């Protein structure tokens, strides 16, 4: 049997805590201790995911988004941390450190688009490099297809919704920042990118990026980050052959798309 602490130490090798942003809260956030034989890897720890872990006999959940972020002032039965402890399930959460890590969230995302000569930028949280020349609409369609195939399918509607702001330039140098990376468009411009592909960007990010000559693709927070769960699961299977590592089937995008 493998202990929670052993898995936590391995996760720190995969995504060193030193890579995390100062405001972040990664780590072993719920520690029920002991040994586990089965682990569930997910993007978010929701009540549905806790129920799935309990149903499948998983004593540990490894997630990207922290289950505890702001200081807790009270705890009730509706809180996910409470539900974890009630079910005896520990939680390891690796957030911005996994964004920045080698083979982490952004390197997995970059690999989906065949990025070459990959470099880190935006203080390590993004990746930029060369891709085969492609138009922005073509790249957006590829994002929708490739990301949808790597995400849990919703009960209704499409799995991924992609929107883009197109300067009309062919994309040869692509920047990717998973999740809410739209505000970092100027960092992508500084790296000579033709396009920034991210999860979320607001109205003004798109206007300003396009005005400055950068195309912008927003493919969804969930969709740009969930693919890393498979990569993390594979790393844990390699490190602990005796451990059964599952990727959550009940972790879904909270949005429904028309």
Pin down the residues of each PLM region.
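Hydrophobic structural segments
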Residues: 1-258
